[in-house]
Structure formats: C-alpha cells, structure tokens
C-alpha cells in the first residue's frame, strides 16, 4: 500500500490529468486514510470505515483517468468495473459479488509478484543450474560446469538453443458455477491443476534460447520457493483492508424519473450493491472475504439521470460527492502541452520512428484547442476525447505519407490546422467528428 501524502498523490495525478482538483483531493485523502487506519490500535481500526466517493461529471473530463492512475499509485488490490455489466441475482449475467472474487484474484497476483521478488536471487541461482543441466547435462564434471558457467555469465551462450522443462501455466479456460453454491466458481483447469499437483506437477518441454529461457525458469523456480497458502491468506487480508473498487457508469443503473422498461433489473443491481458497499461477507474459492473496509469509488456522467435517482440507501453509502467541471479552451491547451504523455508528444514520437521531424507552433496548439471546444459545443460534448479526433484528422495526410518523407521537417501552424479541420460552420461533413 502506498505511503504517499495527499499532496504527493495530487501532484502525481497532476502529471497526467489537468484540473479537477476537488476530485484529486478526495481520492488522495481516501487513499491516505487507508494508511492512517493501519496505524491505529486494533480495537479502533475495525471501527474506522472508509468514506466512499461519488464522482459526478460529464464524459471525458478525467473520471476514468483518475481511476487508472490511482490503480498504479495505490500499490493495493484495485479493480475498475462498469456497473452496467452486472445483473440482479436471478437474472442471466454476472452478479455483483463477482467484483470481490475478481478483486481477490488481483490481490493474489500482487502478493505473488511481491513474493517472487523476495526470492528472486535464489530463483536466479536455481535457473542458472537448470540452464547448465540443459547445456552440459546433469552428470557433467564440476570443472566442465564451471567452464560453461563463466561463458554463460559472460553472455557468450545467449543465442544457443536449449530444451527446458517448465511448469504448465493455465490458459485461462472458462469456469462454471456449481448450482446452489454461489461463489464456488470452478475453472476447468482448476481440476486438472489439482490432479497435476497430486502427481508432482505438470510440465512441458520448450525449445528456446539461453537468454529467453531465464524468464520462464526464474518464474518456475520462484513458484517452487513460495507457499501458495501464505499468498492466499495475505491476499485475502490485503483485499479486506486495502482493496479499492472503482464503479464506473453508475448513472446507467439509476432509475430515471418516469422511465419505463428495465427499471426492476436496474433497481435490483443497486439493491445487490448495497450490502457489498455497506459491508458483507462474500464467499470465494480462497475463503470468505469481508467487504467492510473496501473503499468504493463510484462515478457517472448523470446526463439523463441525477444522483438523487439512485436508491436513497445507496446514496447514503456514498457520502463524499465530488463534481468534475467541464473542460475549457485553456484546459484543452494544457492537456495538449503539460501532461506527461500528451497527444502532441505522442505524435512527435510516433513520427520520429519514421525519421520525420514534427513540430507544432503555439498558434497551432491554440487552434487545436479552439476546434475541440467548438466541436464539443456544436455537436456533442465528449470532453478531452475530442482532441484525439481532431489530432487524427489534422495529421491524417502526414501519418499516411510519413514513410516516404523520412528526414523531412514538418511544421504545423494554425493555418494548417484550419485547412485540415475547417471551420465548423463551413464543414458539411460533420460525421467525421462524431465518435
């Protein structure tokens, strides 16, 4: 779990997201509170509940981007799900408890990686021995092995092909629910894994080069050194105490006033979410998981519905409300120039792979921001995503002809932008800009 202060979390988010300080501060405080709670006495720790957040704002202003960046910062089990993917219990589809089961799988992956790093040195030594076995045989004399070991460490044998045996990894085959036992999701491969382990583990022979064999062998050796039961226990504990669930598109399951149709199913999903957000115990194949201290961050555009259309009980379980503002021309300009991986930097780097030197003047950046704002106001406001449409249109010809213009220098100015995008009023083919 991250130990960043709220100020550090906000400054980290500032590298990728322009504006929206209220939302950044809210998630920064919530993330820091996870760490603060861990410092308390055990008696008080159980009483401190996370303050769940509801982010409200139009599309394309940074709600989902905040969640993506938060996931990398958190250093804790984090899952982002769309509320629309779930159905009420009894209907065909995924029930909301699957969110927690998926979160536990993510937690296991995180803990496993951490444990692998702890035993990496030992695993590397084991991998080296296995490579030597493949090169000179297990019965070779110590002198021969030492001679090859020196060559191996010097990189002289990197391109030599060898046959190695590695443990079979599951290929993600689908699972099935056991009727009458929610949460007891058994994958087809889980069963074969059980039989494989009972017979000493399943392996497969792979032909590869010495250099590329190390990754598989180190992973293999690491897995032998770590205890899966410990990983599962730690993962469940990590999910219960530090887990974060980001519920996107929550406005799509709100009952719109006077709306007809699938209202019952929508309300059912909300009712199923209630115990999850409030605190319940979910059965998973790794044991029961309590959701009392999992942080839930919900977000939605609320274009056609409003937060008050959500069930009152669910509203009460999302006590912190943050409104994200629509983007202005100045915001668009900053998005193009100030963010760490801005679109302009991306396109300059992409064209540089073709030895094409691309440059944007200050007035070109102003023109791009201006066009994006005008298109958003006249067609459909899709926020910062509009910039991708505009940039793609402006650089359409350059991208196509780039391989034939290697070594050239191309300057993009406002005239070039206007010429290729055209004034909104004069442009008849508006469909190009509608995503």
From Swiss-Prot:
Signal peptide: none annotated. It comes from the Bacteria. It is found in: Cytoplasm. SMART domains: AAA (SM00382), ClpB_D2-small (SM01086). GO terms for molecular function: ATP binding; ATP hydrolysis activity; peptidase activity; proteasome-activating activity. The keyword ATP-binding applies. Keywords: ATP-binding, Chaperone, Cytoplasm, Nucleotide-binding, Stress response. Coiled coil: none annotated. One of its GO terms (biological process) is protein unfolding. ATP binds at residues 18, 60-65, 248, 313, 385. GO terms for cellular component: HslUV protease complex. The keyword Coiled coil does not apply. Disulfide bonds: none annotated. ATPase subunit of a proteasome-like degradation complex; this subunit has chaperone activity. The binding of ATP and its subsequent hydrolysis by HslU are essential for unfolding of protein substrates subsequently hydrolyzed by HslV. HslU recognizes the N-terminal part of its protein substrates and unfolds these before they are guided to HslV for hydrolysis. Belongs to the ClpX chaperone family. HslU subfamily. A double ring-shaped homohexamer of HslV is capped on each side by a ring-shaped HslU homohexamer. The assembly of the HslU/HslV complex is dependent on binding of ATP. This is ATP-dependent protease ATPase subunit HslU. It comes from Allorhizobium ampelinum (strain ATCC BAA-846 / DSM 112012 / S4).
